[in-house]
């Protein structure tokens, strides 16, 4: 056990260093081909704990690998998740200094804010919809501390599910005001459309992703908390970002959210 | 080339459609230098033959309206063809594979035109103000060419691969929506296979109709009141198989479905 813990600390430090120095690490799975998904979550938790000890606050979760395309790409059949910290939020229309990211990509998503806690297992999509306070549009800036995004499933999980920053829109909707499955989205980069998407791109329904998360977290004895922000998964493929780029996503019924690099 | 030759090519393509068999593309040996303009001349002859046979035009349809397809075909303008009355399938109805060659399905928004729209310089806003209703639709494309492979003039000559259309029956006023943000899923047997939003069509489906009106104006033609026009695919096309139950769901516009039989 102590050996495992030592390994986990060592790998967590590799990722923390990459984040600090801005130089991507080699994939952990190239260093340790046997690294398991569970170990990877422990590496993630190790780094999150370090940040919390430094004074950062956990404000929510993000769900990744929610599209069939992404799951196929990584050869997996379930999503993954990461933690959102208070220093990851950027105001709508705000700017992200390019030196704060390594190799950013932008995705448009729906974010959930719950009005009551959800503790798995056996949480259903219906439970999520009943527990949802409101839904708000979001941009997620994913980033990888692994060189050239050469990630396998344990690599991205250990790296906080490749989280970077997130931006929330200003317009909120209650569950009865929108059809989550069919809610359309257009993602533009520098005023050119790069992608269109729809809610169903995230496991058929974004609320189903949140239910998955509640159940997955219960394996670690964690619940989803009222007031937390939950990024439910990308509605379209991610678009590469570089300095000078402005991204903007328009959502049916939910307005617009944008960010500049 | 003389009109009679365009007519011969049109007959060659109609034979493929009616006999449900692939034909070698026109540019392979019949006429390797067929131009886009000539492609439309062939299409014009094809339309004329069908009208003479007593078929009725339901409306034009737009093709190659997605960025991906336009890049693939190396063009900067979409194409159009015509939907005829015999191509319509009832919502919830059956499509027989034996009636077609290698059909694919895609989801689209259709415009029911309330007033004539005459180019040039027609904008998407003009189109919306002259649109009576929008309705959801599934289009079955079925290129008459071997392996669905063709050049741009070939596909234009082949009436833009038009084969069958299933229109939804819930009519909505266009000003109730941001049509570019209408989300769409296309499912086969209950499993979502393709999805997208209206903006996949030239940024906005009404933009496709505006381009159509402007393209038609070059020939002294216009979009007509009463036309029901397919604005272009929101999703990628899916090859159909026997037994498929195909369902398109459109945010706020409802659902369209059909079943594929032998």
Model-derived features: where do they sit?
Chain A
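Glycine-rich, small/acidic residue-mixed loop/short-helix segments
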Residues: 208
């Amino acid at each position: 056990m102590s050996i495992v813990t030592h390994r986990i600390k060592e790998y967590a430090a590799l990722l923390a260093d990459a984040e600090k120095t801005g130089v991507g690490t080699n994939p952990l799975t190239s260093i340790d081909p046997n690294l398991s998904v569970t170990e990877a979550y422990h590496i993630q938790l190790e780094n999150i704990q370090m940040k919390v000890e430094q004074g950062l606050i956990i404000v929510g979760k993000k769900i990744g690998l929610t599209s069939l395309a992404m799951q196929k790409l990584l050869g997996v059949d379930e999503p993954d998740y990461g933690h959102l910290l208070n220093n990851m939020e950027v105001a709508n229309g705000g700017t992200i200094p390019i030196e704060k990211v390594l190799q950013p990509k932008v995705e448009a998503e729906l974010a959930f804010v719950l009005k009551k806690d959800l503790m798995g297992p056996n949480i259903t999509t219906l439970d999520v919809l009943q527990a949802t306070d409101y839904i708000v549009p979001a941009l997620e800036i994913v980033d990888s501390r692994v060189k050239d995004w050469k990630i396998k499933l344990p690599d991205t999980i250990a790296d906080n599910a490749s989280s970077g920053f997130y931006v929330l829109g200003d317009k909120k909707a209650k569950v009865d005001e929108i059809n989550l499955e069919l809610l359309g989205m257009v993602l533009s980069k520098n005023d050119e459309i790069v992608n269109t998407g729809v809610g169903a791109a995230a496991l058929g329904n974004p609320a189903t992703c949140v239910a998955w998360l509640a159940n997955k977290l219960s394996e670690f004895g964690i619940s989803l908390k009222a007031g937390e922000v939950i990024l439910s998964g990308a509605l379209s493929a991610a678009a590469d970002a570089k300095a000078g780029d402005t991204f903007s996503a328009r959502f049916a019924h939910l307005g617009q959210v944008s960010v500049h690099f | 080339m003389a009109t009679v030759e365009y007519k011969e090519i049109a007959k060659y393509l109609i034979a493929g459609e009616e006999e449900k068999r692939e034909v070698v593309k026109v540019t392979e040996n019949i006429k390797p230098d067929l131009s886009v303009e000539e492609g439309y001349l062939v299409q014009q002859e094809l339309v004329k033959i069908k009208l003479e046979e007593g078929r009725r035009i339901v409306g034009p349809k737009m093709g190659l309206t997605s960025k991906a397809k336009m890049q693939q075909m190396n063009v900067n303008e979409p194409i159009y063809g015509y939907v005829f009355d015999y191509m319509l399938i009832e919502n919830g109805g059956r499509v027989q594979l034996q009636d077609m060659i290698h059909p694919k399905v895609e989801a689209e928004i259709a415009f029911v035109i309330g007033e004539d729209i005459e180019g040039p310089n027609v904008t998407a806003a003009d189109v919306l103000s002259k649109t009576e209703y929008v309705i959801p639709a599934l289009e079955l494309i079925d290129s008459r060419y071997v392996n669905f492979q063709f050049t741009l003039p070939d596909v234009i000559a082949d009436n833009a691969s038009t084969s069958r259309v299933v229109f939804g029956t819930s009519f909505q006023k266009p000003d109730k929506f941001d049509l570019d943000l209408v989300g769409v899923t296309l499912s086969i047997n209950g499993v979502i296979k393709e999805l997208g939003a209206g903006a996949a069509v030239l940024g906005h489906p009404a933009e496709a109709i505006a381009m159509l009106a402007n393209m038609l104006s070059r020939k002294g033609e216009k979009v007509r009141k009463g036309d029901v026009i397919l604005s272009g695919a929101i999703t990628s096309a899916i090859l159909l198989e026997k037994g498929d139950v195909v369902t398109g769901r459109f945010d706020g516009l409802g659902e369209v479905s059909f079943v594929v039989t032998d």
